[in-house]
A protein has these predicted regions:
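Acidic/histidine-rich catalytic neighborhood of metal-dependent amide-processing enzymes
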Residues: 121, 129-202, 418-419
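Metal-dependent amide/peptide-bond hydrolase catalytic core
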Residues: 2-7, 196-198, 204-419
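Glycine/charged-rich beta-loop-alpha catalytic/anionic-binding loops adjacent to active sites
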Residues: 111-125, 210-211, 386-388
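Beta-strand segments within the central parallel beta-sheet cores of soluble alpha/beta enzyme folds
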Residues: 59-60, 153-161, 187, 248, ...
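Hydrophobic/aromatic beta-strand patches that form the interior of the parallel beta-sheet core
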Residues: 58, 92-94, 159, 185-187, ...
Length: 419
């Protein structure tokens, strides 16, 4: 580690309390999505960044009609752009999201309290992904505040968005499409003990089965939509077993999955149901083609219904989130990250690089042809942090470590001017 990196690490250590306070304020600002009223936290974050001295901070508003179409109430994106040298070096984007899933039940602490217990901060969104916002912010601040021996050249954009939980189309994708960010490389919210270079895609379907209502005393005069749906469900669960035979070659990703997450139907106990709706989640491994998977799914459902007289079915694709990666491990971004991880972390071996079965905003950067890696604040596995569960938390030492690694990685990329 050279003198410049030592100075970066020292600066981050000296500003630990400011980092904790910054994160605590974010956790204490509700940003549940749904309901998706996320303009207030975006405005709050913009103000905090300005007070910290982040350069060129802006609140980028999205068309209200487009926001309403996503089911959200309000939304804005927050950008902060820092230029080094003449800015002709690489343009690196750091992206994390500040919208969170609702707290749910089972908490032993205030989900919006940011309480610190035994070296961990607790709160909804502290792991997913307000801690990443904090790490990225203070990594950039360190680069601007520390006097360097080696000149830096390039640009680092903070891109903080608030619609990841509903797809990210008005966050990273919109910022890319509109030209607000033009990255050569991107780091997206992730974990501290591994780097993620691939993740699954996802298809969401709504299947509406339509029958004919009748009096329960005369069921033969109606067409039972729930009974027809049960046959669709049986076929889907059988199909799920066949999916397990498709294996991904990417470490950390196993096989495609299928989950029926919602069933709704019927009028009353004494009425033959004329309608039943189910929602299905079909995860795609990176090796799969989403269009072919959709075709296979539709054919399966229609085949079942074709054998049931009088029943109609409507299949609506609600979501198609494409997979991400795998990004080659020899890309300069991953190489720089891995080298700094090994220097700063007190862990045996090299930085683990693997895929994950969930899907994230990283896919938007990958689809735009941007070399992307997921790395940030968090444990070895998401379950340890209770992400999307009660008592979500992060270790404050992981916040420190991730910030140091990101700052040193940015330093290497900007010094070397590798794009």
């Amino acid at each position: 580690m050279n003198h410049d990196k030592e100075a970066l690490v020292q600066w981050i250590q000296e500003h630990q309390e400011e980092m904790i306070l910054f994160l605590k304020k974010l956790v204490q600002t509700p940003s549940d999505n749904p309901a998706g009223d996320c303009y207030p936290i975006a405005a709050n974050l913009q103000q905090q960044l300005c007070e910290l001295g982040v350069e060129n901070v802006s609140l980028v508003e999205v068309d209200e009609e487009a926001v309403k179409k996503t089911g959200m109430i309000s939304l804005a994106n927050v950008l902060g752009s820092t230029e080094f040298g003449d800015g002709e070096g690489p343009n690196i984007v750091l992206n994390a999201h500040g919208d969170v899933v609702p707290p749910g039940l089972g908490w032993t602490v205030d989900p919006y309290g940011g309480e610190i217990i035994h070296g961990k901060m607790y709160g909804r969104g502290v792991a997913v992904s307000k801690s990443d916002i904090t790490a990225y912010t203070f990594a950039v601040l360190a680069l601007t505040q520390v006097k360097m021996n080696q000149p830096l050249n390039g640009k680092v954009d903070l891109a903080f968005t608030f619609d990841e939980e509903t797809g990210g189309d008005l966050g990273p994708k919109w910022l890319l499409d509109q030209g607000y960010i033009k990255p050569d490389q991107a780091i997206v919210a992730g974990f501290t003990y591994s780097a993620v270079n691939a993740h699954n895609g996802c298809l969401h379907f709504e299947i509406k089965t339509i029958g004919k209502s009748a009096h329960a005393a005369l069921p033969h005069t109606g067409i039972d939509a729930i009974e027809a749906t049960s046959k669709i469900l049986n076929a889907l669960y059988e199909y799920r077993h066949t999916l397990a035979k498709k294996k991904s070659s990417i470490p950390g990703i196993d096989f495609p999955t299928l989950n029926v997450g919602l069933v709704s139907g019927g009028i009353n106990t004494n009425v033959v149901p004329d309608e039943c709706i189910i929602r299905v989640d079909r995860r795609l491994i990176p090796e799969e083609n989403g269009e072919l998977a959709e075709m296979e799914f539709r054919e399966l459902v229609m085949q079942v219904v074709s054998d049931i007289p009088g029943v109609k079915v409507e299949i609506q694709k609600v979501l198609h989130a494409k997979s991400y990666g795998p990004v080659p491990e020899d890309t300069p971004l991953i190489q720089a990250l891995a080298a700094n991880w090994q220097t700063i972390m007190n862990e045996p071996g090299k930085l683990p690089i693997n895929g994950v079965p969930l899907y994230t905003d990283a896919r938007h950067f990958f689809a735009a042809g941007v070399p992307t890696i997921m790395f940030g604040v968090g444990p070895k596995v998401l379950e340890e942090a209770n992400g999307h569960r009660a008592d979500e938390n992060i270790r404050l030492e992981d916040l420190q470590a991730a910030t140091k690694i990101i700052a040193c990685t940015l330093y290497d990329l900007l010094v070397s001017q590798r794009a």
